[in-house]
Amino acid sequence: MRPNNRENNQPRQIKITRNYTKHAEGSVLVEFGDTKVLCTATVEDAVPRFLKGQGQGWVTAEYGMLPRSTHSRMQREAAKGKQGGRTMEIQRLIARSLRAMVDLKALGERAITLDCDVIQADGGTRTASITGAAVALCDAINGLIENGTLKTNPIKGLVSAISVGIVDGQAVCDLEYVEDSAAETDMNVVMMEDGRMIEVQGTAEGEPFSHEELLTLLDLAKQGCNQIFIAQREALGL
């Protein structure tokens, strides 16, 4: 039996709270069960040097975990003087995922940075970050439309993400920490609302997985992402 008696295809309870902080152009507290991430969007009228004069914008992301977001305290990466490889990998994943939902030409020469700060971790922090940051990004862009900065909406569609895996021989979606740490196969899937996939990250931690198991996991991920899209749309009032 899974934690909280969930079915194998059942994500954790998803809660998305918009306008969580007052200064950022977009701010969201996203909760996947006991995993909680604060996602904020910052708009700047400048682009990275490699994009200057090209008439297009940029979307990037940063990711971090608070010291006591986990069972025992982690040292802040700022105190270490450098980011870890896991952090850099995750924030690049978040940024790639969010750029897929935006027409960068229509955004114009401005940059939007999504900061994803994990308040409490219980598995799936990167997928929760993508899900919450997508809503914060929508809010930031809606603000640009409302104040007349943008004439057309550059959002091409929502993006969501979920973890799937094989635990005790069973394919399951949205793994909690106790499941993730025991998974024979662990996979993260990022999808557009139209069903196209942005990223699939899968690893066999023990026995290799079969082609049939891969297809089963992808189907579970699609089901889970579709439920997340519903939560995102409800949060945005769409």
From Swiss-Prot:
Belongs to the RNase PH family. Phosphorolytic 3'-5' exoribonuclease that plays an important role in tRNA 3'-end maturation. Removes nucleotide residues following the 3'-CCA terminus of tRNAs; can also add nucleotides to the ends of RNA molecules by using nucleoside diphosphates as substrates, but this may not be physiologically important. Probably plays a role in initiation of 16S rRNA degradation (leading to ribosome degradation) during starvation. It comes from Haemophilus influenzae (strain ATCC 51907 / DSM 11121 / KW20 / Rd). Homohexameric ring arranged as a trimer of dimers. It catalyses: tRNA(n+1) + phosphate = tRNA(n) + a ribonucleoside 5'-diphosphate. HAMAP family: RNase_PH (MF_00564). One of its GO terms (molecular function) is tRNA nucleotidyltransferase activity. GO terms for biological process: rRNA catabolic process; rRNA processing; tRNA processing. Phosphate binds at residues 86, 124-126. Gene3D superfamilies: GHMP Kinase, N-terminal domain. The gene is rph. This is Ribonuclease PH. Its EC number is 2.7.7.56. Keywords: Nucleotidyltransferase, RNA-binding, rRNA processing, Transferase, tRNA processing, tRNA-binding. InterPro entries: ExoRNase_PH_dom1 (IPR001247), ExoRNase_PH_dom2 (IPR015847), ExoRNase_PH_dom2_sf (IPR036345), PNPase/RNase_PH_dom_sf (IPR027408), Ribosomal_Su5_D2-typ_SF (IPR020568), RNase_PH (IPR050080), RNase_PH_bac-type (IPR002381), RNase_PH_CS (IPR018336). CDD domains: RNase_PH_bact. PROSITE patterns: RIBONUCLEASE_PH.
